[in-house]
Design a protein with these regions (language model features):
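Extracytoplasmic/secreted proteins, especially bacterial periplasmic and envelope-associated proteins
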Residues: 42, 65-69, 126-129, 165, ...
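Short strand-loop junctions, especially beta-strand C-caps/beta-turns
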Residues: 48-50, 86, 195-197, 270-274, ...
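Conserved beta-strand edge residues that scaffold enzyme active sites
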Residues: 88, 148, 225, 306, ...
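N-terminal propeptides
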Residues: 309-426
Length: 426
C-alpha cells in the first residue's frame, strides 16, 4: 500500500473519530444496502469500474478481456454477480497519470477506466459485447455513474480530483448511463454505488437525494475483496502472489472462525486494474468462490440477495415481514442504514414519512434545500401532513408518537415502530 493511501486512510480514521459527528440515520426512500438479514448461506458479489475490454495483468488468459475472465470464472462456479459499470471516461481530460501504487495512478484530476489514454477500452459505451454477455449470463448491472466523477470533495486521498457541482449534475450523469442501458438493452438498473463512496455534494444534497430522484437503492458492501490494493513487494511476481493471497486468506479465515460469517453479506470486487496496474482478481476470484462453495454458499447478485430480505435487521422469520416488504415498496419506513429498528419508539417525523406521498415528501424537501442549503430529513413529509390536517401544526419531528390518526390506523396503544406499522391500514 502506498504512503499516500496509508496517510489518507489514517487521516480518515482520525477525522471520523475526533471531528466528524456520529452519523444520525433517518428514515427515507433510499437506504444503503451493505448486507441483509438471513440465516441462509447466500451472499452477493459486486464488481466495480468495468466492463474492461483490456486483458488481465499479467495476461495469462490468451488475451481475453478481464471482464471475460471474471465471467468465465463466475460461470464455472455457478455464481452470479452485480457488475457496477461506468459509461465512458473519455471526456475526463486534460489530465496526466499519477504515481503507480498511489490512488492517482490512473489520473490526477480524473479517473480513467481501464487506464489513462485507454478510455476507449472501458465502460458500457465501448463494450457492447461484454454488456450483452453480462446480461445473457443472468448477472445484474448497476449504475456506477457515467463519467465516474466524485459527487463532492474528498480531501485526503482525492484532494486534487475534479468533482460534480451538485444534485442536478449527479442526476444527469446517472441518468445518462441509465438511459444507455434502457434504450440499447431494454435493461432497467435499480441500484447504484457512488464513485469512491463520496456522498456529500457542494450544494447541500447527498447521493441519497440523487438516488431518490433515480428511484435507486444505494448499493454498498460489507466485505472488501481487497483486489484493489497493491503489494509493496518490488518483484512483480511476488507482488502478484501477495495480492492474490490477500484476497483469498481473509475469506478463508472468516469462514474457519464462523461458517455463517458471509450469510447475507455483499463482497466488493474490482473489474479493473489495482493501483499497481495488476489484476489479482483474475487469479483470486476462482479460489474465493471455491472456498465459499466448500462452505455451502450460493453467490448471487445484490438484487437476488434482496429478494431474500431487503432489510439488514429483519428477516423472513419475523411475523411482520411480508407487510413490511410491501410497505417499503411505496413508503419510507426504513432508516438510511437499511435497519427498521422495530423496537424503538416512533417519532412524529418517521410517522410523517409513512403517511406523506413520496413525491410530496421529496419535492418539498428538495425545494427547501435549494432555497436555504439545508433541510431536515422529515421537513417535506411533515409540512405536507400538517397542511392536510393529518398531523397537528404544533408537532415536531423529534417528538414521540402518542396518538395515531384514525383514518390510517387500527386502534393500538403500541407506539413502537413495530406497533405502528402493524396497525397501519395498508
Amino acid at each position: 500500500m502506498s504512503l499516500i493511501v496509508k496517510l489518507g486512510k489514517k487521516g480518515k480514521r482520525i477525522v471520523k473519530k475526533f471531528i466528524t459527528p456520529v452519523e444520525k440515520h433517518t428514515v427515507g426512500y433510499t437506504r444503503r444496502i451493505e448486507r441483509v438479514k438471513t440465516s441462509k448461506r447466500i451472499c452477493a458479489m459486486t464488481f466495480d469500474d468495468g466492463p474492461m475490454g483490456m486483458p488481465a495483468s499479467p495476461d495469462r488468459f490468451d488475451g481475453k478481456s478481464l471482464t471475460d475472465v471474471l465471467l468465465d470464472t463466475m460461470k464455472e462456479y455457478g455464481a452470479r454477480g452485480s457488475f457496477d459499470v461506468i459509461g465512458d471516461t473519455s471526456a475526463n481530460y486534460p489530465d496526466k497519470a499519477g504515481k503507480i501504487g498511489s490512488a492517482a495512478w490512473g489520473g490526477i484530476k480524473f479517473d480513467h477506466y481501464p487506464d489513462i489514454h485507454c478510455d476507449d477500452k472501458g465502460g458500457a459505451e465501448h463494450n457492447d459485447r461484454l454488456i450483452r454477455r453480462i446480461l445473457e449470463e443472468s448477472h445484474e448491472i448497476t449504475n456506477h455513474s457515467y463519467r465516474h466523477l466524485i459527487f463532492g470533495k474528498k480531501p485526503f486521498v482525492y484532494g486534487a480530483r475534479e468533482h460534480l457541482n451538485g444534485l442536478d449534475d449527479a442526476v444527469a450523469d446517472l441518468n445518462r448511463l441509465h438511459q444507455l442501458l434502457k434504450t440499447k438493452y431494454d435493461y432497467t438498473m435499480t441500484l447504484s454505488r457512488p464513485p469512491h463512496y463520496v456522498d456529500k455534494m457542494p450544494d447541500g444534497f447527498t447521493s441519497y437525494d440523487a438516488y431518490d430522484a433515480m428511484h435507486y437503492q444505494y448499493m454498498a458492501a460489507s466485505f472488501d475483496g481487497a483486489g484493489w490494493l497493491p503489494s509493496t513487494h518490488t518483484d512483480p511476481e511476488q507482488a502478484l502472489q501477495a495480492e492474490v493471497q490477500a484476497m483469498i486468506d481473509p475469506i478463508r479465515h472468516a469462514l474457519e472462525k464462523d461458517p455463517d460469517f458471509f450469510c447475507g453479506q455483499i463482497i466488493f470486487q474490482k473489474d479493473g486494474y489495482n493501483m499497481a496496474k495488476r489484476t489479482p482478481v483474475a487469479f483470486a476470484l476462482g479460489e474465493q468462490l471455491k472456498v465459499l462453495q466448500e462452505y455451502g454458499y450460493q453467490v448471487v447478485s445484490v438484487r437476488e440477495l434482496m429478494e431474500e430480505s431487503p432489510f439488514a435487521d429483519v428477516g423472513q422469520d419475523d411475523p411482520l415481514f411480508e407487510k413490511l416488504v410491501e410497505l417499503a415498496k411505496d413508503h419510507a419506513i426504513v432508516f438510511s442504514d437499511n435497519h427498521l429498528r422495530l423496537d424503538d419508539k416512533m417519532t412524529i417525523g418517521e410517522l410523517a414519512m409513512l403517511l406523506a406521498p413520496k413525491k410530496e415528501a421529496i419535492s418539498r424537501r428538495v425545494a427547501k434545500i435549494r432555497k436555504t442549503k439545508k433541510a431536515g430529513a422529515y421537513d417535506g413529509a411533515l409540512s405536507w401532513c400538517q397542511e392536510n390536517g393529518i398531523l397537528p401544526t404544533s408537532a415536531k419531528a423529534e417528538q414521540f408518537v402518542e396518538t395515531l390518526p384514525e383514518a390510517y390506523f387500527e386502534q393500538t396503544n403500541d407506539f413502537t415502530r413495530r406497533g405502528v406499522y402493524a396497525a397501519y391500514k395498508k
